[in-house]
Amino acid sequence: MDIGKFTEKSQQALAEAQNIAVRFGHQEVDAEHLADALVRQEQGLVPRLLDRMGQKPEAFAEALERELGKRPAVSGPGAAPGQIFVSKRLNAVLVKAQDFARQLKDEYVSVEHIFCVLLEEPASTIMGRIAREFSLSREKVLGVLEDVRGSQRVTSANPEDTYEALQKYGRDLVEEARKGKLDPVIGRDAEIRRVIRILSRRTKNNPVLIGEAGVGKTAIVEGLAHRILKGDVPEGLKERGLFALDMGALIAGAKYRGEFEERLKAVLKEVEKSEGRIIMFIDELHTIVGAGKTDGAMDASNLLKPMLARGELHCIGATTLDEYRKYIEKDPALERRFQPVLVDEPTIEDAISILRGLKERFEVHHGVRISDSAIVEAVTLSHRYITDRQLPDKAIDLIDEAAALIRTEIDSLPADLDEANRKIMQLEIEREALRRETDVASRERLERLENELADLRAEQTALLSQWEREKGSIDHVRSIKEDIERTRHAIEEAERAYDLNRAAELKYSRLLELERQLESAEKGGHDETRLLKEEVRPDDIAEIVARWTGIPVTRLLESEREKLLRLADVLHERVVGQEEAVDAVSEAVLRARAGLSDPSRPIGSFIFLGPTGVGKTELCKTLAEALFDTEENIVRLDMSEYMEKHAVARLIGAPPGYVGYDEGGQLTEAVRRKPYSVVLFDEVEKAHPDVFNTLLQILDDGRLTDSHGRTVDFRNTIIIMTSNIGSPYMLDGISEGGEFLSGVREKVMEELRRHFRPEFLNRVDETVLFKPLLPAQIARIVELLLGRLRGRLAERKIDIRLGDVARDFIAKAAYDPVYGARPLRRYLQHNIETPLARKLIAGELRDGTTVEVDVVDDALSFRIE
């Protein structure tokens, strides 16, 4: 007997039979041990055959083990442990199994051959008796085996991989639609009709759905499955099966060369045998190119081509545009066998309709309500702010995550109840400490504490019962909704089966009753102040968007009008003496937000011109804080680093083949991470002229393509470029009242035009001239800087006061029109912060004191109160 002629599963069963014999303490392996091993085999064929015959494999195995337990067991010293022998009877069974395999023209002895021989054991044996008890016979097994195996012969050591290949390596989408496992498909009628038209063709009847990730390619195929189920398809497609092929399952575990091809051929043979009744769906179609390819082996695409060419295989593919170009178009023979169907991103209106159709599924799954305004908000916010993903996928994700957020809040302790629990624990610890004390004050405190604890416990009990009541109410609503969904599914099934009496009974009796129950359950419990939130509202959607994109949620929900009307005031608080600049920036932002400027361009683009230290960069920081709540949302690029021609590549990333290609560009990566920011190009005149060619498409279209081909969205950024061009004209051409003399602006603009090309300057919204600061404005800046110092000293409760004389003295001493306000910070550091630090360390200045700063003998003096 050649053990090499037994399949892998047969060999595993023989090894397991030996283990069973050892476990029972038997001295030889008999037919019953092998039968037990076959019936208990994981993913084995015998349990599947028993299931098909209506017998439970577990019951059969238990009956065998009961009888095996009655046999005499041998223990103690003697033969080497585990050394047992094959009985003469089992040997005969295996020889008969070999003969039976030859009779069926199979090359290997498989588990079904052994099982059929075991069932023919005489009634005097345990095996024969149990087989008759369970009404099992060789003929019955062969009848079921024919359904599973078909006309296939055992020609390899792993024949089970090729049995029922479609069930094993695919999902029947029509069957899943029948069971209600697929989500409803709303819209996409044009694409589904196009797929149906292609499937109805005589040749090249294989559509491939091509579109960006998340636009709903798989949903179109699920929509087709729904239509096939309802019979809403042409005659040629009615009663068709639609199987989604799982390439991962096909490849997984294929250890030896040829094993993958064998599995795929088994799938294709089943499809071929169906004579066009089965349509195969391959998601991620590009995976078939190169799948299973090893030295000398064929990949999946080459196995599919002949059947696709002959029209024996009806196949629907789905893949993205990039992968179609990269894999399918490279193989023209494969490409011409498929007919492309382009799937575009749905419009905002269509995406809202899709989400409305899915709303009920999400409500039932999460057990919460989803308001219609939340659906509209999810689509509009995702379209506006999540630019690197596609509708409807990104909007569905928003709704799903917001509903999950509400559900987790329902399942966890409410904040009020959690706070009450913590207070009770804190007071109980305090009570235990006070019980050890004997003085009168401690006794009084203990008495007060007991009363407080009693009140808190009463509050906790009330809150707990309210929470449980509300949670029970929400769960009750959820169970009613689940019943409604099951009833609707049952109505659809009854209508498909033309069981009109049952359909009418369910529709006009059971469904109406459930809807009445739902209405009364949703009405109840709304009068009291609720602990739990059970509805997804627009603010929940905004909160999720804020988490994903980093935009503060308060800013997102605050009305645009309020935010923009306050913008000029907020900027004036921190930027002193630059009314024209502040007004120009705030007005440009107002125009952009009011929709009077092109929405495809950035919020605003400005060139700030002026001498050093007049507030150009400070205005950028203030603008970032006012619009985006934080100074951190500023992308700052020092243009003196981009003086060489090749440095331009650093903005958008190195081209393919160059070092640093994978790292991305400094500008594009920064804006991709923070799409809502102020982009500051500092000292812009120092950059190479080619940099401005890159900026042209940002200023005009609000977008920039990086070296990887990804489009970065600049529509929600404010572009600011600072420069010192024309500073000498501005310093010399200022009047005593702080206004520019006539002709100064023209000279500065002329200088600017000499530096930059007209097509660049023409795209900038506003060129703003910053005036040199006057002494009066310097005094205000002194107050601003001292305000920041007060903030640092506030932690120690130290206050600092500055008289008018001292303020004017500092302004006069530190002011230099050439350097602007920057010398002020240095002056305050040397003449106020350093002396105060000395006094703090020496112990002269203590917490809670006030420092008066005055001028004595042309120097600052400090008086501590």
Curated annotation (Swiss-Prot):
Spans annotated as Repeat 2: 86-151
GO CC annotation: cytoplasm
Keyword vocabulary terms for this entry: ATP-binding, Chaperone, Coiled coil, Cytoplasm, Nucleotide-binding, Repeat, Stress response
Binding site for ATP 1: G211, E212, A213, G214, V215, G216, K217, T218
Pfam family, one: AAA_lid_9
Location of the region described as NBD1 in the Swiss-Prot/TrEMBL record: 164-345
GO molecular function: ATP binding; ATP hydrolysis activity
Keyword Coiled coil: yes
CDD domains xrefs: AAA, RecA-like_ClpB_Hsp104-like
Gene Ontology terms: biological process: cellular response to heat; protein refolding
Record region (Repeat 1): 6-71
Stretches assigned to coiled coil: 396-530
SMART domains, per database record: AAA (SM00382), ClpB_D2-small (SM01086)
Annotated ATP 2 binding sites: G610, P611, T612, G613, V614, G615, K616, T617
Domain Clp R: 3-151
Chain residue ranges for the region called C-terminal: 773-865
Region described as Linker: spans on this chain: 346-550
Region (NBD2): 560-772
Subcellular location, record wording: Cytoplasm
UniProt function note: Part of a stress-induced multi-chaperone system, it is involved in the recovery of the cell from heat-induced damage, in cooperation with DnaK, DnaJ and GrpE. Acts before DnaK, in the processing of protein aggregates. Protein binding stimulates the ATPase activity; ATP hydrolysis unfolds the denatured protein aggregates, which probably helps expose new hydrophobic binding sites on the surface of ClpB-bound aggregates, contributing to the solubilization and refolding of denatured protein aggregates by DnaK.
Subunit structure: Homohexamer. The oligomerization is ATP-dependent.
Family: Belongs to the ClpA/ClpB family.
NCBIfam families documented for this protein: chaperone_ClpB
Domain notes: The Clp repeat (R) domain probably functions as a substrate-discriminating domain, recruiting aggregated proteins to the ClpB hexamer and/or stabilizing bound proteins. The NBD2 domain is responsible for oligomerization, whereas the NBD1 domain stabilizes the hexamer probably in an ATP-dependent manner. The movement of the coiled-coil domain is essential for ClpB ability to rescue proteins from an aggregated state, probably by pulling apart large aggregated proteins, which are bound between the coiled-coils motifs of adjacent ClpB subunits in the functional hexamer.
Protein name per UniProt: Chaperone protein ClpB
Source species of the chain: Nitratidesulfovibrio vulgaris (strain ATCC 29579 / DSM 644 / CCUG 34227 / NCIMB 8303 / VKM B-1760 / Hildenborough) (Desulfovibrio vulgaris)
Gene: clpB
